[in-house]
């Protein structure tokens, strides 16, 4: 949530001179829909329409950047996967090497790009990352019970990142 409510709005303020509260208020309906559906893909039509109306993003930018972002810009998912893998390693008492940390970083970025924008899809990719660095996948059972609310929050971060990128690109293009 740091990304959605502090980092992105601060960069919006720096690059577009838009007030932080104004930006958060404008994207809140998008975030609310993302939270309730847990799907970047399901929110895409509303995200495109609402970002044009409330953020003033041009139709050209919205129709190119937002679908691309809904597919590959899964920053909430990437952060989640890295945190889960490291958390489970700590639970099992596994000391990770620097190489393993960089492997986790690299794989979570790649896995987040390949994660479908549907609820629960990141669990499969997290298993892949865990097995590639030698962490027992059984540990994921500790997270699965609370994955749904976490998925809802990840989706909020993902769509906020999409609107952030679209806003910056639209500002730079005009």
Residue ranges and their predicted role:
Residues 2-6, 43, 80, 121-122, ...:
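Residue-level signal for transmembrane alpha-helical positions in Major Facilitator Superfamily
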Residues 20, 57, 62, 156, ...:
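Flexible, glycine/charged-enriched surface loops at secondary-structure junctions
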Residues 3-8, 73-76, 111, 150, ...:
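Alpha-helical transmembrane segments of multipass membrane proteins
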Residues 30-112, 166, 174:
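Helix-loop-helix junctions within the multi-pass membrane cores of secondary transporters/permeases
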Residues 17, 21, 25, 95-99:
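Juxtamembrane/transmembrane-helix boundary motifs in multi-pass membrane proteins
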Residues 25-28, 32, 36, 150, ...:
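Membrane-interacting alpha-helical segments
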Residues 1-22:
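Signature of multi-pass transmembrane helix bundles
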Residues 82-174:
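Transmembrane alpha-helical segments and their short flanking loops
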């Amino acid at each position: 949530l740091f990304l959605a409510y502090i980092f992105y709005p601060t960069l919006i303020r720096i690059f577009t001179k838009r007030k932080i509260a104004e930006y958060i208020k404008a994207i809140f309906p998008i975030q609310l829909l993302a939270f309730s559906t847990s799907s970047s893909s399901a929110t895409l039509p509303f995200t495109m329409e609402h970002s044009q109306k409330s953020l003033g993003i041009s139709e050209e930018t919205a129709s190119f950047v937002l679908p691309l972002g809904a597919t590959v810009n899964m920053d909430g998912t990437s952060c989640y996967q890295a945190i889960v893998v490291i958390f489970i390693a700590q639970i099992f008492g596994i000391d990770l090497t620097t190489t393993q940390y960089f492997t986790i970083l690299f794989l979570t970025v790649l896995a987040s790009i390949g994660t479908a924008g549907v609820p629960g899809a990141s669990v499969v990719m997290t298993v892949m990352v865990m097995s590639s660095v030698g962490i027992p996948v059984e540990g994921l059972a500790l997270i699965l019970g609370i994955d749904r609310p976490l998925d809802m929050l990840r989706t909020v971060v993902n769509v906020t990142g999409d609107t952030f990128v679209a806003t910056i690109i639209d500002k730079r293009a005009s």
